Amino acid sequence: MSKNIMKIHVIYLFFFLGLSSQISFANETGSQVPPRTEDYPAPPLYKGKPAKLSLDSELARTFRTRLTAALSQKPVYAGEYVLTGWGCGSSGCYDQVLVNKRTGKVLDMVFNAYSSYDVNDESDIRVGEWIESPQIDSSLLTTVKVENSQDGKHFVYYTNYYIVDKNQLTLIKTVQDSK
């Protein structure tokens, strides 16, 4: 192989490595940018009569009374969803669900959190995932998720971003928080 061809190969190699590292760096820095609520507009606010609770899921059949009562509330998320919840036993356990006021359908995702005593700083920590701030004018839903670390010595905090489409929540991004 001639020296000129080798030089060209080396130049291409450095160019490729430099380009791929820039792409990698862009993905890493861009990955922590949270989605914005204004990028996920909701349909117009539903102002009609609440639908009858749809009993097409085990969740709806199990919590029929609580979910039916929730349909009388004003929507708080994505133009037509009401947020409701209930205690689920000991340790400050709490479940949250969203119900579509227009269709009466329950989103099948249950958000669940409970209190956990942290012996390191003698405080109660909420562990699990819960809805942080539903927005009536956006289909973007933000949740906080707290888990025990793999070594069990501290907690790991995340912010999860979901969008609702056709009565289904889809996780679109998870960002690990530094707490």
Question: Residues of each region from the PLM?
Answer:
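Short aromatic loop motif centered on NTY/YTY
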Residues: 110-164
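Terminal domain-start segments
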Residues: 25-74
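Bacterial N-terminal signal peptides
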Residues: 12-21
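Surface-exposed loop/turn elements that mediate protein-protein interactions on large endomembrane-trafficking
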Residues: 46-61, 98-110, 160-174
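Bacterial N-terminal signal peptides that target proteins for export
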Residues: 2-12
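Cysteine-rich, disulfide-bonded extracellular modules and peptides in secreted proteins
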Residues: 35, 102, 106-115, 151-156, ...
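Mid-length scaffold segments of soluble, non-membrane domains
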Residues: 73-112
